């Protein structure tokens, strides 16, 4: 029988948000947020996902309980911090990464850091709505610092993912803009050359919305010597906000990890 522990305090709560601890879970799923996002959305997955998975959502500096900390300005710095937080909880169980958009790049660099420094790899990496890190077709990120508040509001409406009533809330927008600026600056500085050989060995699955403007997701296959799959679901860049899509993703992740564990062990 599944054992679950619901708690306000979490293990290593500074960086990792785990709302539902499952001591009997076979796998740990580590989720990485989109630009301007927090940990809550993915942390809630742990309450409804299959009992085989314990979900930990990454909480970046400058938001939620870390709001007093300065924003990170380097993706490699973020990866190092995440790895330090992860090590105590991933040594005893298989784990996987899921990242959406900006979070896909953090997940990738974190996986690289784990392999290079600790000879560890996620059982499976799930990326979402993100061009390959070395792709020449990565979307041009607008310079948020040069946009007016109204232009940022329009950009959020077009891009999706943020409810309209929140975008029109002045207090919310004032909180959101600094987060977006910090994360967008990281994305703009993140440059990655096409690898001459595979950097990872585990399978990568890429989810994307059918109406998303993101291109060259196929380039992720250059990253790994493992299998690579693309799954297209109805919707735009934030297709995963649709309940049916979210349920599909969670169920698919569980099935993939069950199959991957058979090959791995």
UniProtKB/Swiss-Prot annotation:
Residues with the N-acetylmethionine modification: 1
Annotated catalytic residues: 101, 237
GO cellular component: cytosol
Keyword Lipid metabolism: yes
Enzyme Commission number(s) from the entry: 3.1.2.14
InterPro entries the UniProt entry points to: AB_hydrolase_fold, TEII, Thioesterase
Keyword Cytoplasm in record: yes
Subcellular location: Cytoplasm, Cytosol
Reaction(s) catalysed by this chain's protein: (9Z)-octadecenoyl-[ACP] + H2O = (9Z)-octadecenoate + holo-[ACP] + H(+); decanoyl-CoA + H2O = decanoate + CoA + H(+); dodecanoyl-CoA + H2O = dodecanoate + CoA + H(+); tetradecanoyl-CoA + H2O = tetradecanoate + CoA + H(+)
Protein purpose: Contributes to the release of free fatty acids from fatty acid synthase (FASN). Has broad substrate specificity, giving rise to a range of free fatty acids with chain lengths between 10 and 16 carbon atoms (C10 - C16).
Subunit structure: Interacts (via C-terminus) with FASN.
Name of the protein in question: S-acyl fatty acid synthase thioesterase, medium chain
Provenance organism: Mus musculus (Mouse)
């Amino acid at each position: 029988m599944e054992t679950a522990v619901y708690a306000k305090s979490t293990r290593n709560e500074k960086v990792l948000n785990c709302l539902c601890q499952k001591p009997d879970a076979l796998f740990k799923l580590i989720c990485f947020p989109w630009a301007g996002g927090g940990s809550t959305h993915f942390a809630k997955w742990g309450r409804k996902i299959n009992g085989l998975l314990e979900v930990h959502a990454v909480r970046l500096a400058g938001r939620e309980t870390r709001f007093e900390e300065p924003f990170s300005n380097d993706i490699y710095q973020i990866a190092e911090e995440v790895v330090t937080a992860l090590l105590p909880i991933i040594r005893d169980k298989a784990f996987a990464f899921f990242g959406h958009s900006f979070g896909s790049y953090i997940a990738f660099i974190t996986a690289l850091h784990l392999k290079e420094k600790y000879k560890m790899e996620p059982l499976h990496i799930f990326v979402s709505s993100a061009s390959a890190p070395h792709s020449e077709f990565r979307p041009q990120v607008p310079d948020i610092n040069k946009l007016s508040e109204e232009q940022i509001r329009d950009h959020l409406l077009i891009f999706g993912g943020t409810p309209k009533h929140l975008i029109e809330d002045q207090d919310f927008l004032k909180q959101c803009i600094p987060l977006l600026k910090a994360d967008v600056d990281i994305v703009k500085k993140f440059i990655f050359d096409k690898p001459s050989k595979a950097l990872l060995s585990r399978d990568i699955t890429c989810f994307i919305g059918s109406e998303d403007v993101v291109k060259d997701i196929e380039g992720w296959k250059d990253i790994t010597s493992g299998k690579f799959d693309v799954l297209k679901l109805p919707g735009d860049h934030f297709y995963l906000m649709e309940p049916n899509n979210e349920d599909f993703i969670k169920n698919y992740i569980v099935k993939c990890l069950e199959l991957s564990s058979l090959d791995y062990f």
